[in-house]
Amino acid sequence: FEGNKLPSKIVTKSYIIDEPNNLPILSITAFPETLFGREIGIYTNEIKSREAPVNVQLFEKDGNMAFEVDAGLRLTGQASFQYPQKPLTIETASKYGDEVIDYPVFSNRPFEQYTSIYLRNSGTQDNRHTMFRDALQHTIVINQMDLEAQAYRPVATYINGQYWGIYNIREKLDDNYLVAHHGIDPDNIDYLEYEFQPEPIVLAGDTKAYFALQNFLSQNSMNIEAN
């Protein structure tokens, strides 16, 4: 903070001492007020419309750091984001410092870079029970059936040094997922999501083709092979 000098990049280090290491460790560091502040804290106030800048470090079970990124953190999910342990999305962007997570996060996927990962709390149905039922279902069919499935790995999570429980790291189901898995032109994706309202939320593209398909299905018989 010396006068007439440019500030340097913030350096973040995580030290997990004398804690069980039977799971990989995910350490998230942020300015406390951006997560838990009474006025601007996205976690305390359950704000889903804004990201908080964070540093994220993943340590494998052998203690070696797998990756470190400066990224954005936002609340995700629907009803489950009201739980004490909230679902979170970590998304890289140049404005935070890193554009990708340069690491093969999931052993059963061929990808070595990710722009986002999803920290799932096992959802409304399973957060307070097994914590892995949804992930187990995806693991059973992944690379075995012609179905969309999200890779998963559990991690012991710390936020600002405080243990935050087990999260399931999942592939983020978004337009980047579709590009990576299917080679789709990112400018030719309509990605819609329903969240407790009759009209879809447009995350990418628009609703024209979707509603045209709905109209076709409602006005034409699917018993006719040509349809």
Regions found by a protein language model. Name each.
Residues F1-N227:
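Phosphate-handling architecture centered on phosphoinositide signaling
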